[in-house]
Amino acid sequence: MLNILPLLQKALRLSDNAKITKHPSGAVNDVYRVQDEGNDDTSSSADYAVKWLGNDTFSGVNRTHQFVLQQQLHSLDIAPRAIWLSDDETLWVEQWQPNIKVAQAKPETLANVLARIHQLPITARPLNLIERWQHYINVANLEPNDSLYLHAISLRSKVIKSEQDDNDLVLCHNDLLASHVLCRANDIPVVIDWEYSAMGNRYFDLASCCLINKLSIEESTALLQCYTTILGISFDEALAKFQLHKEIVSVTNDLWFKALGQSEAE
């Protein structure tokens, strides 16, 4: 386990009684919980989630922008409060979410959360998939004759058109695993891991959610049906757009893993 507690004690003014424990995390970042009951002469206490981002050399995520975005999301009661980001952007601290449980990967639950996110009155930076794809291609050192590279190029015009559709341009989470949805006592969920959030096409977010949660065709259809019912969108029109974005999401996912694999090999 990384020895990051001394740095956190200084940055967050923690007491000598502060304790750190490692928690399950994703493929790139390490996650810790820091708890501090304070010293004998103070009643202050703290409970933080800490992400070590130093292993991420490939994603191209603008951490400072995402930090400010999460502060806005917290003000709307849908994300933990972002507290501190180190100058080198390798350490991210946010409030730990107490007394919670992870949501079940039910299509209806995920549809409701996505519908809520997509209606938030927040404007973030655009996803800009073409630029992101090119970044992954560069990191992965894909050759112009690589089948994945050619697949991405063949979708270029459709991706550009997708991101110019104002009717479907919304704030997207873009990484909505069921484990990123935490249930609270008031039944209003809080969502974590917003690092890939951006303004994008709602159907990219929907298709991404279905892919990473490994939903079946039937479950994906149920999610889309519930989502369109909530927002009053034509299901037939939504289904056609969803099918296109399933392919776009698949290419994005493959490029991401190619870039990750190359960065780990270096």
Protein language model features and the residues they cover:
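Conserved N-terminal boundary motif of the eukaryotic protein kinase catalytic domain
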Residues: L14-K22
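An alpha-helical support segment within catalytic cores of ATP-dependent transferases
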Residues: L2-S15, I122-N174, S179, R184-N186, ...
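Active-site acidic catalytic loop and adjacent metal/ATP-binding pocket
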Residues: P24-D36, D41-A49, K158-F204
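Start-of-helix signal in alpha-solenoid helical-repeat scaffolds, especially tetratricopeptide repeats
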Residues: A240, L244-E247
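Activation segment
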Residues: N55, N99, P189, S197-M199, ...
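ATP-binding pocket architecture of kinase catalytic cores
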Residues: H23-P24, V28-L127, S147
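Active-site activation/catalytic loop segments of kinase-like enzymes and analogous catalytic loops
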Residues: Y203-I233, E247-S263
